[in-house]
Amino acid sequence: MTQPDRYAVFGHPIEHSQSPRIHALFAAQTGQDLIYTAEDVPPDRFESCVRAFFDGGGRGLNCTIPLKEMAWLLADSRSGRAKRARAVNTLLLRADGSIFGDNTDGIGLLRDLRDNLGLNLAGTKILILGAGGATRGILAPLLAERPDRLVIANRTVATAETLTVEFGDLGPVEGCGFAALAGRRFDLIINATAASLSGELPPLPADILAPGGSCYDLAYAAEPTPFVRWGQEKQAVVSADGIGMLVEQAAEAFLLWRGVRPQTRPVIETLEAERRTAK
């Protein structure tokens, strides 16, 4: 009897992950025979665990916080968008035994913002909180939407400024510390820090969200994250967490692995309904 193909997501922490549920729904929808699990893999064990997974018959991996830049280094070859981001969230074992790295975060975020939430980013002022691997993965697609300005705020200013040098050819991008945000307003604020995973909120001026502005947290949880609640308190038109992005980027990874694109809207609706029921 043929065994189902094996896939997994590696992260640290990982117990909150909805990825196994998402890929189970994708597999049922498309008739694909596979198993997808979530594995807690600390950074110091990442490479050995990846090698062991693929040596043991695994076909593909997702990598989440804090492993995306390590996955970029490990991959033998990379997609154009992964090369640009210098971060990888999807690994594929090729027939020749080499490991291919892709980054589906940016297109996943863009599809959720644009197609699911109905946001038009052209001419807007965008603020991204954090300058890690998650931010690297979303910068190029966001700048391709031609915002008026994109600002990256980070506790370590030099890290944010490094990204402005790397991505400055794609559009108007600048880096700064959180203190430099005083007196500025933005139409879309994206939280790409890990603060929500520990129940914290990045330090933001009270009036930083422009009237009619929106908030988006790349993280997600069973309950609204502190950043999503902050956006709701500021009367954001949209204040959403990253569950839609997670589904959209997962669909792109599923396409890479299986050659078929699942429908995302039914899966997003199922997850939202399950969250409401669980409350």
From Swiss-Prot:
State the pathway, as annotated in the record: Metabolic intermediate biosynthesis; chorismate biosynthesis; chorismate from D-erythrose 4-phosphate and phosphoenolpyruvate: step 4/7
List keywords of the entry alphabetically: Amino-acid biosynthesis, Aromatic amino acid biosynthesis, NADP, Oxidoreductase
List, in alphabetical order, the GO biological process terms annotated in this UniProt record. amino acid biosynthetic process; aromatic amino acid family biosynthetic process; chorismate biosynthetic process; shikimate metabolic process
Pfam families linked: SDH_C (PF18317), Shikimate_DH (PF01488), Shikimate_dh_N (PF08501)
Q: What do the Gene Ontology cellular component annotations say? A: cytosol
Q: Name one GO molecular function term.
A: shikimate 3-dehydrogenase (NADP+) activity
Claim: NADP is one of the keywords in the record: yes
Recorded catalytic activity of this chain's protein? shikimate + NADP(+) = 3-dehydroshikimate + NADPH + H(+)
Q: Cross-referenced SUPFAM superfamilies, in alphabetical order?
A: Aminoacid dehydrogenase-like, N-terminal domain, NAD(P)-binding Rossmann-fold domains
* Entry EC no(s): 1.1.1.25
NADP as UniProt keyword: yes
List of residues binding shikimate: S17, Q18, S19, T64, N89, D105, Y220
Q: Which InterPro entries match?
A: Aminoacid_DH-like_N_sf, NAD(P)-bd_dom_sf, SDH_C, Shikimate_DH, Shikimate_DH-bd_N, Shikimate_DH_fam, Shikm_DH/Glu-tRNA_Rdtase
Active-site residues (renumbered)? K68
Q: Which domain of life is it from?
A: Bacteria
Binding of NADP(+), residues:
G130, A131, G132, G133, A134, L218, G242
By sequence similarity, the record places it as follows: Belongs to the shikimate dehydrogenase family.
Q: How does it assemble?
A: Homodimer.
Q: What does this protein do?
A: Involved in the biosynthesis of the chorismate, which leads to the biosynthesis of aromatic amino acids. Catalyzes the reversible NADPH linked reduction of 3-dehydroshikimate (DHSA) to yield shikimate (SA).
Under what name is this protein listed?
Shikimate dehydrogenase (NADP(+))
Q: Which organism is it from?
A: Methylococcus capsulatus (strain ATCC 33009 / NCIMB 11132 / Bath)
The root-end lineage is: Bacteria, Pseudomonadati, Pseudomonadota, Gammaproteobacteria, Methylococcales
Identify the gene encoding this protein.
aroE
